[in-house]
């Protein structure tokens, strides 16, 4: 059985290698191969264009993560839903450059926004006297990027974090 299967594969390979431009199957096969090659080239071009824009945006912000606001104001639960629907996340800066990029958005809008602090965090930027759970169980960043405990019911600027893994 294996011998028959191997023979069939060998014959198919020989048939495909010969091209057979004149018969309809050969023409169709050549057309499919040509289409795949065109699609591969288009994909490579799109990937290059995407990476160029992403690198330019990252260069401008100093962070691989992008922080974007839709200028809406909302409570923590609304923010989670909005960011999820947009394909992003609630901001969670892991490094100083990410926190700076996040703070730039807040400074530009002159508003505070929620963020999530991982436990244990590699990076924190708590303001003096913070965290203070008496102020609330959520965390917000001020326009300078300093972190404060906050109520989850505060209406703050909606900012979502986006990052790309390639």
Curated annotation (Swiss-Prot):
Gene3D superfamilies: Mannose-Binding Protein A, subunit A (3.10.100.10). Belongs to the alpha-type phospholipase A2 inhibitor family. One of its GO terms (molecular function) is carbohydrate binding. Expressed by the liver. Glycans are attached at residue 122. This phospholipase A2 inhibitor binds directly phospholipase A2 in the presence or absence of calcium. It is found in: Secreted. Keywords: Calcium, Disulfide bond, Glycoprotein, Lectin, Phospholipase A2 inhibitor, Secreted, Signal. Residues 1-19 form the signal peptide. Its main location: secreted. The lineage of its organism: Eukaryota, Metazoa, Chordata, Craniata, Vertebrata. Disulfide bonds join 83-160, 138-152. This is Phospholipase A2 inhibitor clone 09. Homotrimer; non-covalently linked. The keyword DNA damage does not apply. The keyword ATP-binding does not apply. Pfam families: Lectin_C. One of its GO terms (cellular component) is extracellular region. It comes from the Eukaryota. Residues 46-161 form the C-type lectin domain.
């Amino acid at each position: 059985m294996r011998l028959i299967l191997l023979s069939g594969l060998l014959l198919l390979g020989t048939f495909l290698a010969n091209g057979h431009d004149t018969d309809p199957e050969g023409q169709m096969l050549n057309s499919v191969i040509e289409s795949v090659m065109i699609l591969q080239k288009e994909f490579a071009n799109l990937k290059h264009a995407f990476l160029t824009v992403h690198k330019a945006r990252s260069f401008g912000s100093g962070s691989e993560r992008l922080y974007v606001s839709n200028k809406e104001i909302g409570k923590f639960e609304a923010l989670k839903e909005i960011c999820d629907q947009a394909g992003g996340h609630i901001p969670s800066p892991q490094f100083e450059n990410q926190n700076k990029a996040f703070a730039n958005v807040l400074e530009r809008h002159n508003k505070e926004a929620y963020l999530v602090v991982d436990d244990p965090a590699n990076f924190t930027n708590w303001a003096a006297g913070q965290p203070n759970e008496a102020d609330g169980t959520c965390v917000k960043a001020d326009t300078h990027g300093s972190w404060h405990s906050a109520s989850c019911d505060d209406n703050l600027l909606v900012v979502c974090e986006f990052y790309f893994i390639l």
